[in-house]
């Protein structure tokens, strides 16, 4: 059973991860059921009733800052009694997932909690002068949540360190997979990708691409630095509440909106360099997709990117506290004659991620399920 704080139609890292896990569990013949936030009077778009052949049980939700938050409900116990899973997988537990973990522990069902969202940093950002105080309170809540799990999985070494530093017990590392067939350097030769490049770079500009939510927590204000880098053009893929502000700050940039599947892969194929700005990423899935597409990556030297980018080999890391550091990291990679360097970095970036397929990562996840089941059996004994 998977209890998730986010699911379709919302598109984000939590949803993508859960969907890929379900697809690969189906391919291995496992049985599963999903509990997810459903529709509400304020958010009427439907949550699917099934995914990858598995039933999806929706619970009442309320909107919070454009996110659906599933309300804790005794429905979870009812579903648990009926389904009787061998293990419960809780994706990014914070509200709905807490109820899932509590119910699993009460019924003696082993549980694996997947830590995916740096909620303390997000809360700090939106709490003004009380930011540090509220962040500490968030960590106390996270510790209380994850103490109920038999195993907590962190997506990166930075996240693993944060969890351990805040006394979260029983933590292990589990990364994320990438579809290296969809995100592939050959997309660059696709006629539709070539047409997109001609439209975006009519004068041969070097295209600097960003993919992700257009929202304050992504710290996209840093992109203003890049507007002054000659011979380049920014291309942003994604939607969010910051789009109107960014369009005014970046009048020369191209905004492609939300893209999925092959259209997203072609967008990566059109880029020459991938840039990321946020410092609160527990992993950084779009960085991994860019690497699979054969792109060098420039990202902050903080959080998930530390695992994904090797300086001077697969891209560059910049100091997010130093004004102008992003532009300084980008300039050498877009200078005349730098195409060969970008190509070499992109090839090495792809070589390193190509084996991180979702099938391989779900095999690791199933091993973690077995570990949690063994730990639960020992604690009962």
Model regions: which residues?
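Donor nucleotide-sugar binding/catalytic pocket of nucleotide-sugar-dependent glycosyltransferases
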Residues: 36, 139-194, 202-203
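Aromatic "clamp/platform" in nucleotide-sugar-dependent glycosyltransferases that forms part
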Residues: 279
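Conserved donor-binding/catalytic core segment of Leloir-type glycosyltransferases
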Residues: 197, 201-231
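Conserved acidic donor-binding segment of nucleotide-sugar-dependent glycosyltransferases
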Residues: 311-312, 316-323, 332-338
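Short alpha-helical donor nucleotide-sugar binding micro-motif in glycosyltransferases
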Residues: 80, 145-146, 258-259, 266-271, ...
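A short, well-ordered alpha-helix in the C-terminal region of glycosyltransferases
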Residues: 341-355
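Short hydrophobic beta-strand element within catalytic cores of glycosyltransferases
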Residues: 296-299
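N-terminal subdomain of nucleotide-sugar transferases
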Residues: 1-57, 358-366, 370, 377
């Amino acid at each position: 059973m998977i209890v998730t704080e986010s699911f379709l139609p919302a598109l984000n890292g939590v949803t993508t991860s859960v969907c890929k896990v379900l697809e690969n569990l189906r391919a291995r013949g496992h049985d599963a059921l999903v509990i997810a936030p459903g529709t509400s009077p304020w958010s009427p778009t439907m949550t699917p009733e099934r995914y990858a052949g598995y039933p999806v049980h929706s619970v009442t939700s309320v909107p919070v800052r454009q996110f659906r938050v599933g309300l804790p409900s005794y429905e979870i116990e009812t579903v648990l009694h009926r389904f009787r899973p061998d293990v419960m997988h809780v994706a990014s537990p914070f509200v709905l997932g807490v109820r899932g973990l509590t119910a699993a522990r009460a019924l003696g069902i082993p549980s694996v909690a997947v830590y995916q969202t740096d909620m303390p940093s997000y809360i700090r950002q939106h709490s003004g002068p009380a930011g540090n105080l509220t962040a500490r309170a968030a960590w106390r809540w996270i510790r209380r949540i994850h103490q109920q799990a038999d195993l907590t999985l962190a997506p990166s070494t930075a996240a693993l360190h944060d969890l351990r530093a805040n006394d979260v017990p029983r933590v292990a590392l589990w990364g994320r997979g990438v579809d290296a067939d969809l995100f592939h350097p050959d997309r660059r030769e696709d006629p539709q990708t070539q047409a997109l490049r001609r439209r975006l770079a009519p004068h041969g500009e070097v295209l600097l691409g960003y993919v992700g939510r257009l929202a304050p927590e992504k710290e996209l204000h840093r992109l203003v630095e890049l507007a002054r880098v000659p011979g380049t053009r920014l291309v942003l893929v994604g939607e969010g509440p910051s789009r109107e502000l960014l369009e005014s700050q970046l009048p020369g940039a191209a905004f492609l909106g939300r893209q999925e599947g092959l259209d997203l892969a072609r967008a990566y194929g059109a880029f020459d360099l991938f840039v990321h700005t946020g410092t609160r990423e527990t992993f950084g899935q779009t960085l991994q997709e860019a690497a699979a597409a054969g792109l060098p990556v420039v990202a902050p030297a903080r959080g998930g990117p530390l695992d994904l980018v090797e300086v001077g080999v697969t891209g560059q890391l910049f100091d997010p506290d130093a004004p102008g550091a992003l532009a300084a990291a980008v300039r050498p990679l877009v200078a005349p004659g730098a195409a060969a360097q970008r190509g070499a970095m992109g090839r090495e970036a792809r070589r390193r991620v190509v084996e991180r397929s979702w099938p391989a990562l779900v095999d690791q996840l199933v091993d973690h399920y077995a570990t949690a089941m063994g730990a639960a059996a020992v604690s009962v004994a």
